[in-house]
Design a protein with these regions (language model features):
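C-terminal substrate-binding subdomain of Rossmann-fold SDR/epimerase-dehydratase oxidoreductases
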Residues: 33, 207-320
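N-terminal Rossmann-like NAD(P)+-binding domain of SDR-like oxidoreductases, especially those catalyzing
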Residues: 2, 7-182
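Flexible, glycine-rich phosphate/dinucleotide-binding loops
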Residues: 53, 94, 136, 185, ...
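Short, solvent-exposed loop/helix junctions and linker helices
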Residues: 23, 106-109, 157, 192, ...
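NAD(P)-dependent short-chain dehydrogenase/reductase
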Residues: 153-155, 165-222, 227-236, 263-267
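Structural element of the ATP-grasp superfamily
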Residues: 115, 167, 202, 294-295
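Short beta-loop-alpha junction of Rossmann-like oxidoreductase domains
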Residues: 138-139, 187-189, 293
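Conserved alpha-helical elements of sugar-nucleotide-dependent glycosyltransferases
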Residues: 29, 198, 257
């Protein structure tokens, strides 16, 4: 798979302008997507309300708009010519969505609807949306495909699914791709947020206290994907021809239990102990991706494995 600075697969999709909007640009994934788009020769306008993102994450080579996308005043600051919108802004924790469901709705659904209307008004060619595995809810112990039944368990999942449905409503006016993100981890993740990001939570606790508190069973399972692989998938979703109208699982297809994650993390922080407590509301017991569509549509066939990804992440945190 192509890495930063290496040639990537050819595409016949031609964007009429080199200007793209990346939302959530001060966040973990959005900042890296923006940097990659700049590297590929695009002019990036980045948007973030800085409620959770960090100014230090924002690439210095982009134009930055600070504001809440649920507010029309922010939308009016966006460029009148734009080829693609890569929408990664939003509240990203299922657990936290129960704290204030209305705020979660504004962050994840109202903001998306506003951006959809903006994208249509300026003739955007491609709208890429950060959806989530949370739309599926509890599923059988088998790889979950995009066309399977959806039944979200959290306010967060409901909001993500609603945004997908808004994109479906406007499908004739806007070419979009729903990226159903699985458990993304890696360098740059917010280590102070202990309510979002399983790998980052466990690694942060291990490094700080050599003690990890696990909310829920060690037999729960997930699909962990390294941030570099996610960035590559987003670039392809924005620029590949023929992918509009797709919903794509962004995972590796590898079933990994919480116990396996803990052993991997403990391998980098000797002497770490583990305490198991009650699960959080709306938490899925287990889920991992069927990646057939990711492989066929976006031609993603190689991924960073968990052991190597955690090694890179741990080294990054220890030297940061």
């Amino acid at each position: 798979m192509a890495r930063l600075g290496e040639p990537r697969l050819a595409t016949t999709f031609v964007l009429v302008t080199k200007t793209v909007v990346v939302t959530g640009v001060a966040g973990f994934i959005g900042s890296r997507v923006a940097a990659r788009m700049v590297h590929e020769g695009f002019s990036v306008v980045g948007v973030d309300d800085l409620s959770s993102g960090k100014v230090a994450n924002i690439p210095s080579t982009i134009e930055f708009v600070e504001g809440d996308l649920a507010v029309q005043g922010t939308i009016t600051k966006l460029p009148k010519q734009c080829a693609a919108v890569l929408h990664l802004a939003g509240q990203s924790s299922g657990e936290m969505s129960f704290d204030d469901p209305v705020a979660d709705l504004h962050k994840n659904t109202v903001s998306t609807l506003n951006l959809i209307q903006y994208a249509i008004s300026v003739g955007v060619q491609r709208f890429v949306y950060a959806s989530s595995m949370s739309v599926y809810g509890n599923v059988p112990d088998a790889p979950i495909a995009e066309d399977e039944h959806v039944a979200p368990l959290s306010c967060y999942g409901v909001g993500k699914l609603a945004a997908e449905n808004y994109l479906a409503v406007f499908a004739k006016q806007l070419s979009s791709v729903n990226m159903r993100m699985f458990n993304v981890y890696g360098p740059g993740q917010d280590m102070s947020n202990l309510r979002q990001g399983m790998v980052s939570i466990y690694l942060a606790q291990a490094l700080a206290n050599k003690h990890i508190v696990v909310k829920g069973s060690l037999e729960r399972f997930r699909d962990f994907i390294f941030v570099d692989d996610v960035v590559e998938a987003w670039l392809r979703a924005a620029t590949f021809d023929g992918v509009g109208g797709s919903t794509i699982n962004v995972g590796t297809g590898v079933r990994t239990t919480v116990a396996q994650v803990l052993e991997t993390v403990k391998g980098h922080v000797a002497g770490t102990t583990v305490e198991v407590t009650d699960p959080t509301p709306g938490d899925q017991n287990g889920i991992y991706a069927d990646t057939a569509r990711l492989r066929s549509v976006l031609q993603m066939n190689e991924f960073v494995g968990l052991a190597e990804g955690v090694r890179r992440f741990s080294e990054y945190v220890k030297t940061a």
